[in-house]
Amino acid sequence: MTRTGKVTVVGAGFYGSTTAQRLAEYDIFDEVVLTDIVEGKPEGQALDMNQSRPIEGFETKVTGQTTSPSGEGYEAISGSEIVVITAGLPRKPGMSRMDLIETNAKIVRSVTEQVVKHAPEAVLIVVSNPLDEMTALAAKVSGFPHHRVMGQAGMLDTARFSYFVAERLGVPVGSVRTLTLGSHGDTMVPVPSACTVDGKPLADLMTADEIEALVQRTRNGGAEVIALLKTGSAYYAPSAAAARMARAVAEDSGAVLPVCAWVDGEYGISGVYLGVEAEIGRTGVRRIVERDLTEPELASLREAAEAVRAKQADVASL
């Protein structure tokens, strides 16, 4: 098998370590680097993952590296083609993503500065919350072209929507196609007009009230998991989404995925990072793919853009 380069995951919490394991098991990279500021944690996790290689049959090497906020240890990420930033505080029950903003902004800023220093050609995939704001901050701090900075949100939200539809109708998840745009938060915009089950419009299978109930459940999908866990937040589905994005970049696949990307004129929206569908390849976002939205859906997307724009401007000053 031909492998491609090096990918780094910053943050060895549940989210980051699970992402690293998924990336290693793809067996398409020469090396997966996992970093964290907790001494020994990434090294121990990397050792554990490497010991799974004979069982799972992958040859990708996993390297763990303890780092410090001042930059020690970051030389391990040098030459990374992709960097996934998962570092930051997770939500707790009762918290919104915005409650994390000040602390996580400092973390994302610090990490991004080290990425610029050691992996200046990397594609950045941001997953730290609040997602849209942290993605915009990473883009600003890095100075990278907008196409090389994107955030993981839409894939996760879309997956949650699809699962809830499949669960409600009792059908295989593979038969369901859904889409969510907008922000990774209160102004998330699930798009019922784009939803089908075995090619049939969702509106033909469920009432408007039933669909709206699933839309609301999707918006609260992360909070529902957190409330059940009591400690920590979701990481199985989020890590699957982040790893899938990284794979699309590594393989230059041209896959069309819902991601947080820079919007510059699409949908009549400009100058903001927002959840949209995008074609993903080696250089990051190749192009935004516009859907034919209903008037209410388009209005909701534009409202989401304005709400996110104001928050992104505030974060830039932190």
PLM regions and their residue ranges:
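Glycine-rich Rossmann-fold phosphate-binding loop(s) that bind the pyrophosphate
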Residues: 12-13
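Rossmann-like NAD(P)(H) cofactor-binding subdomain of soluble oxidoreductases
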Residues: 96-162
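Conserved N-terminal Rossmann-fold NAD(P) cofactor-binding segment
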Residues: 37-80, 309-316
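N-terminal Rossmann-fold NAD(P) dinucleotide-binding loop
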Residues: 16-17
